[in-house]
A protein has these predicted regions:
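Short, flexible cytosolic linker that couples an ABC transmembrane/permease module to its adjacent nucleotide-binding
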Residues: 2-3, 121, 222-226
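Structural motif detector for alpha-helix initiation sites
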Residues: 35, 100, 223, 295-298
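ABC transporter nucleotide-binding domains
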Residues: 8-11, 18-194, 199-213, 217-219
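Short, charged/small-residue-rich alpha-helical element at the C-terminal edge
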Residues: 232-305, 311
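ABC-family P-loop ATPase nucleotide-binding domain
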Residues: 1-17, 308-311
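ABC transporter nucleotide-binding domain
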Residues: 178-268
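Generic structural signal for individual residues within well-ordered alpha-helical segments
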Residues: 104-105, 120-123, 175, 227, ...
Length: 311
């Protein structure tokens, strides 16, 4: 995976850190996100995701390092390329007493867009037609999410920053939003930066995923390569883990542990064929049915990556 060209970068942070007293909320994070890319920013609650976003948006000043958005240096109190940026917080804000239609007209006016065309387009795009006269306070959580996304998209931004964008949506709604974001990236050339703790959804939407843990960006992966790698690993749940690990290591297999302490085996010649591993262990004296073998799942991979135990 090649490095993005400097002129093609929409988000760039250079060794950015943020301190709250003695707590290092963000620790030397360097991000490079391309034009037209969907980038997933993944971490547990408190990992540093929201603090990073607030620095991207110029809401807070880094303790050290530099932030660039759309090629422009970002610092609080200075102007920024905000006419090119759309942002949706985890709990979208709206004027509660205004209807959906009035909220979108107001958002359009704040962006200095002429007429009602942008508001009508967003109502159709986010399937809010039935709710145009409903006050924002009376919407379901899912429709509040739709309204928040509509407000973020209303001015055709070059960069869309989303914090937990599918919270409160049903499965059908999640699929709709996923396809909408892909369309924004592929057809409109928008860059989409998704912050979330939900690896499953992020891996379905993003091209690349950055893992932040305890303030540090500890890994970046290609989502398709991650999915393929899971199918190249087998998880063995055996009673005698130490005995099985020792035997398989003697047989030349690289044996690791997943987040739950189960054996993790990367064996391209047998992956996808768990029955062969069962047969090998049975021949070695492990009783039949003694071993359960499956591909590693996303949750196990994530917890193993950040070094946390499964609970």
């Amino acid at each position: 995976m090649g490095e993005p060209k400097a002129g093609n970068l929409i988000i760039e942070t250079r060794d950015v850190s943020k301190l709250y007293g003695s707590l290092k909320a963000v620790d030397r994070v360097s991000l490079r996100v391309r034009r037209g890319e969907i980038y997933g920013f993944l971490g547990l609650n408190g990992a540093g995701k929201t603090t990073t976003i607030r620095m991207l948006l110029g809401m807070i000043r880094p303790a050290s390092g530099e932030v660039f958005v759309c090629g422009q240096s970002i610092l609080p109190g200075r102007g920024g390329p905000w006419e090119r940026v759309g942002y949706m917080v985890e709990t979208p804000r709206a004027w509660p007493e205004l209807t959906v239609e009035e909220n979108l007209r107001a958002a359009s006016a704040l962006r200095r867009l002429k007429g009602d065309g942008a508001a009508r387009r967003m109502i159709a795009l986010l399937r809010l037609d039935e709710y145009t006269k409903v006050r924002a306070r009376d919407l379901s959580q899912g429709n509040k999410q739709r309204l928040g996304l509509a407000k973020a998209l209303i001015h055709h931004p070059d960069l869309l920053i989303l914090d937990e964008p599918v919270n409160g949506l049903d499965p059908a709604g999640i699929v709709e939003i996923r396809e909408l974001l892909r369309k924004s990236a592929v057809e409109d050339g928008a860059t989409v930066f998704i912050s979330s703790h939900n690896l499953g959804e992020v891996s379905r939407m993003a091209k690349r995923i950055g893992i932040i843990h305890r303030g540090a960006l500890i890994r970046e992966v290609d989502a398709e390569e991650l999915e393929a790698s899971l199918h190249r690993s087998l998880v063995l749940d055996v009673r005698d883990r130490e005995g099985a690990a020792s035997f398989l290591a003697r047989e030349g297999y690289a044996v690791d542990r997943d987040a739950a302490g189960r054996l993790l085996l990367s064996a391209p010649e047998v992956c996808g064929k768990p029955e062969e591993i069962n047969a090998i262990l049975v021949r070695a004296g492990f009783p039949p049915g003694y071993v359960a073998v499956a591909s590693e799942d996303l949750e196990s991979w994530f917890l193993r990556t950040i070094g946390e135990d499964a609970c």
